[in-house]
């Protein structure tokens, strides 16, 4: 019985579709000319991981400092992918005010899974950002 539980757990984890759904892996954030993108913000996420990282995309270059996001992007990002050897710092209010959080290289298909204080989450909460790569 003790061997059966870990075996069933391993089987269940393998059977689950990719935890990152349709989100690109951080290594894929490169342009055709070889330069890299620091991060991509996506407007749509979904309870199903396979439907995340869709809709309009905001690509952020290394060194981008946006205390105010472009028109239509404030408080709309629901999924996020950060490139290899990069990190993005986000703020909940324009002008780099409010709550803050750093996301390192990786795929974050559902920002509602990341807490912002006691009652909030980061889905539709990003109003400012700074992205850098090493």
From Swiss-Prot:
Signal peptide start-end: 1-21
Function: Functions in exocytosis in pancreatic acinar cells regulating the fusion of zymogen granules with each other. May have a pore-forming activity on membranes and regulate exocytosis in other exocrine tissues.
Disruption phenotype: Mice display reduced rates of protein synthesis and intracellular transport of secretory proteins. According to PubMed:15040787 mice lacking Sycn display atrophy of the pancreas associated with an elevated amylase content.
Oligomer status and interactors: Monomer and homooligomer; most probably hexameric. Interacts with GP2.
Organism: Mus musculus
GO BP term (any one): exocytosis
Stored PANTHER family: SYNCOLLIN
InterPro entries the record matches: Syncollin (IPR028137)
Compartment(s): Zymogen granule membrane; Zymogen granule lumen
Keyword check for Transmembrane helix: no
GO CC, one annotated term: zymogen granule membrane
Taxonomic classification: Eukaryota, Metazoa, Chordata, Craniata, Vertebrata
Keyword tags: Cytoplasmic vesicle, Disulfide bond, Exocytosis, Membrane, Signal
Protein name: Syncollin
Principal place of residence: membrane
Post-translational note: Contains intrachain disulfide bonds.
Membrane topology: Peripheral membrane protein
Record bears the keyword NADP: no
């Amino acid at each position: 019985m003790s061997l059966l539980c870990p075996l069933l757990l391993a089987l269940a984890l393998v059977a689950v579709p990719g935890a990152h759904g349709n989100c690109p892996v951080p290594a894929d954030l490169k342009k055709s000319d070889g330069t890299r993108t620091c991060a991509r913000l996506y407007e749509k996420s979904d309870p199903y991981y396979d439907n995340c990282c869709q809709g309009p995309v905001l690509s952020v270059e290394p060194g981008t400092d946006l205390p105010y996001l472009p028109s239509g992007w404030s408080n709309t990002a629901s999924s996020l992918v950060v490139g290899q050897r990069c990190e993005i710092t986000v703020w909940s209010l324009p002008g780099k005010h409010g709550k803050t959080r750093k996301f390192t290289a990786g795929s974050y298909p559902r920002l509602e899974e990341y807490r912002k204080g006691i009652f909030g989450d980061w889905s539709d909460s990003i109003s400012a950002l700074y992205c850098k790569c090493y």
